[in-house]
Design a protein with these regions (language model features):
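PAPS-dependent sulfotransferases, especially Golgi type II membrane carbohydrate sulfotransferases
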Residues: 2-12, 258-354
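PAPS/PAP-binding and catalytic site of the sulfotransferase fold
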Residues: 22-34, 235-261, 277-297
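PAPS-dependent sulfotransferase catalytic core
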Residues: 1-92, 99, 105
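Soluble or luminal CAZymes and related metallo-dependent hydrolases
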Residues: 68-83, 145, 200-207, 322-329, ...
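PAPS-dependent sulfotransferase catalytic domain
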Residues: 106-262
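Phosphate-binding/switch loop-helix module in NTP-utilizing enzymes
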Residues: 71-97, 110, 116-127, 150-154
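Amphipathic alpha-helical segments that form well-ordered structural scaffolds
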Residues: 25, 29, 207-215, 250, ...
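Loop/turn-to-beta-strand initiation segments
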Residues: 97-101, 162
């Protein structure tokens, strides 16, 4: 099975995202709970949330791999395997019912911890992975990882998925993530020492770019030129999601979802208005922090994804909001990410394609 073989042979889609790309908005618009031909989980994905949290709470994410203790290695192996098993279980449920399986995942959450360690340590060499996902028998013997596959999944496993990508302008996504991190720190869900490495890890599109290139290189030859109007793998830009309904409708058709269920308006649950859901007295849950805008809106907020973004003008706002030091660093992250964003945006599913 290959990742971009058409509908009948690939019935599971993984939407590859990074923080603050409006992925929660996209999932709400897709109305997965009303898609009679699809199965997901209650979050529309995030199967590797527990692995992400474990990496933080054990400090494994911020510790060079060669300095991991045996306990850290064992814990991370177990949690990645556990999350993978849940992903496969839900996928198998969808397959048993003849339905499409849809999941979204931040690319950093299923990236090899060794690749993350090398990146945060600014190492050019490739450290061997401490994580070895055990695949079910139907997938056969692992056949290795190609150079630009920095995920925890071997090549032949990734080929059983239709990978699609969601991107958002770095000047919108990165400062939004920083605001969220500061709010999580305020709510005692993030520690001060985490903010810098988490920003460095997430204020880049390199992970999405590498995986996109892997997908393109490994898709079946007939698909590379079978439709001149549509480029594979599919890429969505958050700006198009908010402003061009035809693009999202086309995306639905291409991955096996029914566009009739798409939503641009919804009701706001009373208990989430203003302050969000609290998981313990006086503190919002992490989910409430990350979804605050979405949970307190009744429709798509188009002004959150403007068509034109002036980085220089945004920089002035960052200086006022974050201080000059962070404003300067934010601009550096954004400008360094722009080549990858521009590259991926040029590949996006467009209005004229729809």
């Amino acid at each position: 099975m290959h990742v971009y073989a058409f509908a009948a042979s690939v019935r599971r889609t993984l939407l590859v995202t990074y923080p603050r790309t409006a992925s929660n908005l996209l999932v709400r618009m897709l109305s997965l709970e009303e898609q009679e031909n699809a199965i997901s989980n209650e979050k529309g994905g995030y199967f590797f949330w527990d692995s992400f949290i474990k990496g933080r709470t054990t400090n494994s994410t911020y510790t060079p791999i060669e300095s991991w203790t045996p306990q850290q290695t064992e814990e991370m192996q177990q949690i990645f395997q556990h999350d993978f098993n849940r992903l496969e279980s839900t996928s198998n449920l969808a397959e048993s019912q003849g339905k499409v399986f849809f999941a979204k995942e931040h690319v950093q959450w299923f990236t090899d911890p060794a690749a993350i360690s090398d990146y945060l340590s600014h190492k050019d060499s490739r450290t061997p992975s401490p994580v070895n996902i055990k695949l079910p028998n139907p997938y056969g013997t692992p056949q290795g990882f190609s150079a630009n596959n920095l995920s925890i999944f071997p090549d032949h496993y990734l080929k059983t998925w239709r990978l699609t990508f969601l991107i958002r302008h770095p000047a919108l996504a990165f400062p939004s993530f920083y605001r969220a991190m500061r709010e999580l720190e305020k709510e005692e869900f993030a520690q001060t020492h985490e903010i810098c490495p988490l920003m460095e890890l997430n204020a880049t599109l390199r992970w999405s770019r590498l995986l996109y290139d892997w997908c393109y290189q490994h898709q079946e030859e007939p698909i590379k030129g079978c439709d001149r109007d549509i480029q594979y793998p599919l890429v969505l830009d958050a700006q198009d999601i908010a402003h061009h309904p035809a693009v999202l409708a086309k995306y639905c058709k291409l991955i096996g979802l029914n566009p009739v269920h798409l939503k641009w308006e919804w009701n706001v649950p009373d208990q989430k208005i203003q302050k969000g859901v609290e998981d313990r007295i006086g503190h919002k849950s992490p989910e409430a922090v990350m979804k605050f805008t979405l949970d307190n809106s009744s429709h798509v907020l188009k002004d959150k994804t403007p068509a034109i973004v002036d980085i220089g003008l945004e920089r002035k706002g960052w200086d006022r909001e974050f201080g000059i030091s962070i404003g300067e660093q934010m601009e550096k992250w954004v400008r360094e990410a722009m080549p990858d964003y521009t590259y991926l945006r040029a590949k996006r599913l467009r209005v004229q394609d729809a």
